[in-house]
Amino acid sequence: DIIISGGENISTVEVESVIYSHPDVQEVAVIPVPDNKWGEVPKAFVVPKPGREPKAEDIIDFTKSHLARFKAPKYVEFGELPKTATGKIQKFKLRDREWQGHRRIN
Protein backbone atom coordinates (compact mmCIF):
# COMPACT_ATOMS: atom_id res chain seq x y z
CA ASP A 1 0.00 0.00 0.00
CA ILE A 2 0.94 3.58 -0.60
CA ILE A 3 -0.61 6.13 1.71
CA ILE A 4 -1.13 9.59 0.22
CA SER A 5 -1.13 12.02 3.12
CA GLY A 6 -1.32 15.71 2.28
CA GLY A 7 0.26 15.02 -1.12
CA GLU A 8 3.15 12.98 0.34
CA ASN A 9 3.57 9.30 -0.53
CA ILE A 10 4.19 6.96 2.40
CA SER A 11 5.13 3.31 1.87
CA THR A 12 3.43 1.05 4.40
CA VAL A 13 6.27 -1.46 3.96
CA GLU A 14 8.84 1.17 4.95
CA VAL A 15 6.89 2.12 8.09
CA GLU A 16 6.30 -1.54 9.00
CA SER A 17 10.01 -2.28 8.63
CA VAL A 18 10.89 0.39 11.19
CA ILE A 19 8.18 -0.65 13.64
CA TYR A 20 9.24 -4.32 13.34
CA SER A 21 12.67 -3.23 14.59
CA HIS A 22 11.18 -1.90 17.85
CA PRO A 23 12.25 -4.27 20.66
CA ASP A 24 8.68 -4.71 21.98
CA VAL A 25 7.01 -5.53 18.64
CA GLN A 26 6.29 -9.05 17.43
CA GLU A 27 4.05 -8.23 14.44
CA VAL A 28 2.76 -5.10 12.72
CA ALA A 29 0.49 -4.05 9.88
CA VAL A 30 0.25 -0.46 8.65
CA ILE A 31 -2.67 0.78 6.59
CA PRO A 32 -4.05 4.14 5.45
CA VAL A 33 -6.99 5.47 7.45
CA PRO A 34 -9.20 8.47 6.64
CA ASP A 35 -8.20 11.87 7.99
CA ASN A 36 -10.17 15.09 7.56
CA LYS A 37 -7.07 17.28 7.24
CA TRP A 38 -4.61 15.11 5.28
CA GLY A 39 -6.94 12.76 3.38
CA GLU A 40 -5.16 9.66 4.71
CA VAL A 41 -2.72 8.97 7.53
CA PRO A 42 -0.87 5.83 8.62
CA LYS A 43 -2.32 3.63 11.35
CA ALA A 44 -0.28 0.79 12.86
CA PHE A 45 -1.80 -2.39 14.23
CA VAL A 46 0.75 -3.90 16.60
CA VAL A 47 1.08 -7.28 18.29
CA PRO A 48 3.51 -6.84 21.20
CA LYS A 49 6.06 -9.49 22.10
CA PRO A 50 4.93 -11.71 25.00
CA GLY A 51 5.35 -9.93 28.32
CA ARG A 52 5.81 -6.52 26.68
CA GLU A 53 3.37 -3.62 26.90
CA PRO A 54 4.50 -0.78 24.64
CA LYS A 55 2.44 2.39 24.56
CA ALA A 56 1.19 4.00 21.35
CA GLU A 57 3.43 7.02 22.01
CA ASP A 58 6.47 4.70 22.24
CA ILE A 59 5.77 3.28 18.78
CA ILE A 60 5.05 6.69 17.25
CA ASP A 61 8.15 8.32 18.78
CA PHE A 62 10.34 5.37 17.76
CA THR A 63 9.11 5.65 14.17
CA LYS A 64 9.68 9.42 14.12
CA SER A 65 13.27 8.86 15.26
CA HIS A 66 13.92 6.67 12.18
CA LEU A 67 11.74 8.23 9.46
CA ALA A 68 10.36 11.61 8.46
CA ARG A 69 7.76 12.70 11.02
CA PHE A 70 4.88 12.62 8.52
CA LYS A 71 5.53 8.90 7.90
CA ALA A 72 4.98 7.92 11.54
CA PRO A 73 1.60 6.41 12.36
CA LYS A 74 -0.93 8.88 13.69
CA TYR A 75 -2.71 6.04 15.49
CA VAL A 76 -1.57 2.74 17.00
CA GLU A 77 -3.89 -0.11 17.98
CA PHE A 78 -2.74 -3.18 19.90
CA GLY A 79 -4.18 -6.67 19.52
CA GLU A 80 -4.23 -9.72 17.29
CA LEU A 81 -4.11 -9.35 13.50
CA PRO A 82 -6.50 -11.12 11.11
CA LYS A 83 -4.65 -13.84 9.19
CA THR A 84 -5.18 -16.46 6.52
CA ALA A 85 -4.86 -20.16 7.31
CA THR A 86 -1.22 -19.92 6.21
CA GLY A 87 -0.48 -17.02 8.57
CA LYS A 88 -0.50 -14.10 6.09
CA ILE A 89 -1.85 -10.86 7.58
CA GLN A 90 -5.16 -9.86 5.99
CA LYS A 91 -4.74 -6.10 5.70
CA PHE A 92 -7.91 -5.82 3.64
CA LYS A 93 -9.96 -6.73 6.73
CA LEU A 94 -8.31 -3.93 8.68
CA ARG A 95 -8.85 -1.48 5.79
CA ASP A 96 -12.50 -2.47 5.37
CA ARG A 97 -13.16 -1.83 9.06
CA GLU A 98 -11.34 1.52 9.13
CA TRP A 99 -12.88 2.83 5.90
CA GLN A 100 -16.47 1.84 6.71
CA GLY A 101 -18.60 4.89 5.92
CA HIS A 102 -15.74 6.63 4.04
CA ARG A 103 -14.73 6.64 0.40
CA ARG A 104 -11.07 6.26 -0.51
CA ILE A 105 -10.16 8.59 -3.36
CA ASN A 106 -6.90 6.99 -4.56
Segment roles from a protein language model:
Residues 98-106:
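Acidic/polar alpha-helix N-cap and adjacent early helical turns
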Residues 1-71, 80-82, 87, 93-96:
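AMP-binding/adenylate-forming catalytic core of the ANL superfamily
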